[in-house]
Amino acid sequence: MKKKLLLILLCILQSVLFALQAQNTQRNIAYTDDNVRFTVISDGALRLEYALDGKFVDDRSHMAINRLYPQVDYKLKTRGGWVEITTSKMKMRYKKNSGQFTDKNLIITAAKEMLPFSWKPGMQQKGNLKGTYRTLDGMDGDTQTQTWVADTKKGEKLKLEDGLLATDGWTFIDDSQGLLFDNDKDWDWVKERPANGGQDWYFMAYGHDYKAALKDYTLFAGKVP
C-alpha cells in the first residue's frame, strides 16, 4: 500500500514539474512577416527563418529538437526599413522585404560588453576550436599508420572537423537542409523538408564564454542524454 501511494505521489509531482516547465517556456518569436521570422532562443542565440511561401517550420528537426525556450529580455525596433533585435550579447539587423538572407541585407554585431565581431552571411570563422573525427582507426597519435583506412592516407596527419565553438566569439549553424520529425503519434520518424528554397539558420554569440555557448546550444538542440 505504501509503495502504491509513493508511486502515485511521484506521478503527481512529475506532472506538476512538467506543467511548471511548460509555463516557463514559450516560442519567443520576436518578429514575423510574410517571408521572415526571427526567434530569440536566449540572449546569445537566435533563429532566423526565410520562407518564400510564408510557411515556416514549426516541426522539430534532427538537429533542433526544442521549439519552446525560456523567457528572454530583448528589444525589437523597426526603423528606416530595417528590423532590429537587440539582446545583452548581440544586435541583429535585417532590411525588410529584401528577400533571402544575404550579406547585403543581414548583419549581426556584438554588444558593447562582448568580444567585438561583425558577422554577415558568408563569413567564415578564423579560430574554430575543432571537433571530432569519424574514426581513429590506424592512428598513432595524430598520424595515420595504415593504408586500408578510407578517410586518410598513410603518413597523413589527423584532420579534425570544425566544432561548435570558436575564438571568434560566434557560431553560425545552417539547418536549412536538415531532416524534420513527422510527429507521428505512434512512431516519430524523420522526413525531408519542403523544397521551397527556405532558410533555417541559428546564430550564437558568446565571446569567450564557451560554457554559456554550450548551454545555449542545448536550448534548441537538446541536452546530452
Regions found by a protein language model. Name each.
Residues 8-16:
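Bacterial N-terminal signal peptides
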Residues 29-31, 37-39, 72-78, 83-84, ...:
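Short, exposed beta-strand/loop patches in secreted or surface proteins that constitute
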Residues 26-50:
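Mature N-terminal segment immediately following signal peptide/propeptide cleavage
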Residues 19-22:
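Boundary at the C-terminal end of the N-terminal hydrophobic targeting segment
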Residues 1-8:
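Bacterial N-terminal signal peptides that target proteins for export
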Residues 41-80:
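A low-complexity, Ser/Thr/Gly/Pro-enriched, surface-exposed linker/loop concept
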Residues 78-225:
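Catalytic and substrate-binding clefts that recognize carbohydrates or anionic sugar/phosphate headgroups
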